[in-house]
């Protein structure tokens, strides 16, 4: 269905290179800065959006499967050297790239953060197992409808058009979602979302957490074949 009205999409990425403890108590898990999301807000995923009108919280099983499928199909495409886009393209094939699996702990942390209706990155989201990276997106429209999660994931993947493998001139703000999506060493993903109305805008906010984190220093996104 075509969405009428004015639509814009905001994307932010981040570089994560954080330490973590083995403790299950999230208040004891250390990050570069800030308090862990589950320590600060608790484990409840109940929306905490103030005066904003919440229209939907959490991902359906079908949406979770679609997000995972999109990521793995795109990772496979890049790894096989079939991605022709780039600056310049094509992207080189990879020696190896993990197949992502869904992680409920990462998803819970993502959902708790999404449920705050505060667009931006949380300060600390590590687990006892992993340093954790994050992609976020928010689609907003004046129409009485909400964009799909698959559209937002596709926007992350489409950043490949700005990426040159191995170049030091890549700008994270332009390619950071793509590089996290195809970070070869990442093994797990978990996401959360919320739909709400704010000052007449229908907003759909998606948060995806990745473990272990990508976008680490000067490491390559993957080793080319």
From Swiss-Prot:
Q: Where mainly located?
A: secreted
State the PROSITE patterns in the record.
CRISP_1, CRISP_2
Gene3D superfamilies, A to Z:
CAP (3.40.33.10)
User: CDD domains annotated for this entry?
Assistant: CAP_euk (cd05380)
Under the heading InterPro entries, the entry gives: Allrgn_V5/Tpx1_CS, CAP_dom, CAP_sf, CRISP-related, V5_allergen-like
- Residue limits of the SCP domain? 69-210
From what superkingdom does this record's organism come? Eukaryota
Task: Cite the entry's keywords alphabetically.
Answer: Allergen, Disulfide bond, Secreted, Signal
Cysteine disulfide partners in this protein: 27-39, 31-124, 49-117, 191-208
Regarding protein family, the annotation reads:
Belongs to the CRISP family. Venom allergen 5-like subfamily.
- PANTHER family in the record: CYSTEINE-RICH SECRETORY PROTEIN-RELATED
**Under what name is this protein listed?**
Venom allergen 5
This chain's source organism reads Vespa magnifica
